[in-house]
Amino acid sequence: MKICAITGSTGILGKRVLETLPFKFSKFRGNIANFKEVKHWIFKNEFDLLIHLAAKVPTKQVQSNFKKALKINHIGTKNIVEALKLKKNKPEWVFFASTSHVYKLNHKKVKTSEKEKLNPLSKYGFTKKKAENEIMRLKNMKIKYCIGRIFSF
């Protein structure tokens, strides 16, 4: 059975992943913005896959506390990538939950292509775009990854 490391397992999406996917899970339960905590969890556990769902999501909360959102969404993701860089036994695959907010979309224009240039209109989209840039660094480590841009209007 595959072992899957997961962040954000207490959120709406995380709970569904735990209920649905047939893996043994290693859940991160700490401060994603704290590199030492992230590194300890990554080094303490052996896993085949990593699903990164932890995020500060409600756009109103991101607007009201941008600094905290940036720490969770961007720095938290950077911490995962940096810890994986140091880990000898790397996962086969990483999934990162991003958002449609990385595109320049509005309620009138909801049709887009994944090839469209990233141009976030919101602070939330900005934090997730920065996080996506961190995830793309996994390619240099020969780790396969998928960035899932979840649409919600």
Indicate residue ranges for each PLM-predicted region:
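Catalytic helix-loop patch of NAD(P)-dependent Rossmann-fold dehydrogenases
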Residues: 64-67, 71-78, 102, 106-147
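N-terminal Rossmann NAD(P)H-binding glycine-rich loop of SDR-like oxidoreductase domains
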Residues: 2-22
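SDR active-site strand-loop-helix element
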Residues: 7, 50-54, 94-100, 148-150
